[in-house]
Amino acid sequence: GTDQVFASLEKAQFATPTIALIPNMKGYELARAAGAKTVTMVLYASDGMAQKNASMSMAQADEITLEILRLAKQDGIEVIATIAVAFACPFDGPTAASTVEKGVARFMKAGADQVVLADTIGAADPQQVRALTATLVEQHGAGRLGCHFHDTRAMGLANVYAAVESGIRRFDSSIAGLGGCPFAPGASGNVATDDIAM
């Protein structure tokens, strides 16, 4: 399985840390056994996406992530808490900034090493991004915040720039803009690494 592939990677050969994306406690246990030093858990800013992507509510996903966070701290593993549909959800519509702010505060307080805002369906615009990230940087500082943008509406790079203006310096990206979301029809891949690097 994926855990065997991860365990066989020569991680020292990578310029950046390898990160295991885990869906639940079983995923955490497999990642830990495979030698993962950093894991990413997905949280949700809407119940619609939580149900479609993980067959659970937002509250259930939060509780599982908090439990994994406690274990990871004991195990010396870093945790990235990624908040999906931080700007809009294909099932529930626009996401209230207050929902995202509460989620970020909860996981910052719980000790997440990073909290990432994910524009899962690529619906955000620079004005939204600038407003939300500026507020969050003011509340928590920029050091543990990051962003994850999809380029569905060709706004990904503009959204990166808006977040940079707020002080964010950590971004997810993918080679040649690969990626997508199986539960977000029409959503394209992530912002391309080569575009961000330029």
Regions found by a protein language model. Give the residues of each.
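Alpha/beta enzyme core
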Residues: 8, 25-52, 61-78, 86-147, ...
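Core AdoMet radical
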Residues: 16-23, 51-59
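Conserved hydrophobic beta-strand within the GNAT/NAT acetyltransferase core sheet
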Residues: 20, 147-149
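Short gly/pro/ser/thr-enriched loop/turn and capping motifs at secondary-structure boundaries
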Residues: 46-49, 177-182
